[in-house]
Amino acid sequence: MPTMAEVARRAGVSVSTVSHVVNRTRFVSPEKAQLINDAIAAMGYQPNELARSLKVASTNSVGLAISAISNPYFTDIICAVEAECARLGLMVFLSDTQEDPDRELQVVRAFHQRRVDGVILAPSGSPERAIAYLADKKLPCVLIDRFADDRFDQIGVENETAMRALIDHVASFGHRRIGYIAGQPGLATTRERVDAFHASLAANGLECLPHYVSPENVDTASATASTHAILSLPAPPTALVTGNNMTTIGAVRAIREKGLSIPRDLSLVGFDDFEWADCFEPRLTLVEQPCTEIGRQAATLLSERIASSHAPPRAVRLKATLQARESCARPVNRRSI
């Protein structure tokens, strides 16, 4: 365990300055405080007085760690968390972990060092170390969107029900060859949606062909490449389902690069309705997730967890809504698109 003196050396300040920042006993310039807090987070320094007492004075602040702020899906969630926390009298510290497990661990450590009352976390694909740290420090936490650990309160959508609605919709047009472009590897939501895709096909009496499924796509570019590969098969699917908004964009790009028309040549549906989905031609059929409600309830759950740390963890699943638009039509039998 690093010492306060080692933190001081790394930050290039005196031990007393580090002590003032840790104990909040004297004003320290923001520049020096940032150097010290960065050193504390990087070294994993744990103040002895905090370790001796789990009950420190409330700071009326919470940390919000988002795995990819650039993803439009999280915009409404962030706004709702901040609005509800403001109503509850809580300040929100926001950080982007950039889907990086190392940065994720650094962020939750920094939140703890700043003595936030709790954390709302949208986990990365490999959140084990960050979650273990939160559990070890007994820091109240709510996981959003990605169900990763049953030791914490969690909130997300009913992925199985939403996928069933998508497949039922596509099958109602007569499609029997349906492909799937899944989302990021390692995420519980990705696994749930892949499993639900298989189950929903079976429920409709349809066969799931392995070469019609791209189970892991890290970004829009990989979704574009996966869509190209599936559409180049000798007997490609007549409809595609996408696992999130990024894979939807990648699929649309590949379809257009192939010179194909939606839905004349290929039907397309997917997860994550987004604000400019109406700007596509045709307008896309997508599952709308209740992002505002996810954010609001996440803040409420955390506030209740802070007030009652011994209550059993809760898992909340919210219903998503199918927004049926114009991107589905009856299938056209094609070979080697």
Where in this protein do the model-derived segments appear?
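Amphipathic helical "hinge" segments at domain boundaries
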Residues: Y45-G118, D195-H198, L209
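N-terminal helix-turn-helix DNA-binding module of bacterial transcription factors
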Residues: M1-N60, Y73
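Bacterial carbohydrate/catabolite-sensing allosteric modules
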Residues: M1, V15, A42, A80-L88, ...
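Secondary-structure boundary/capping motif
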Residues: V28, Y73-F74, R103, R151, ...
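Short beta->alpha connector loops
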Residues: Q98-P101, A122-P127, M246
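Acidic/polar helix N-cap motif
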Residues: E6, R24, D100, E158-N159, ...
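Short beta-strand segments enriched in small/hydrophobic residues
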Residues: V15-H20, L54-S70, H169, R177-Q184
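Short histidine/acidic/glycine/proline-rich micro-motifs that form metal-
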Residues: A68-N71, Q98-E99, G125, G183-A188
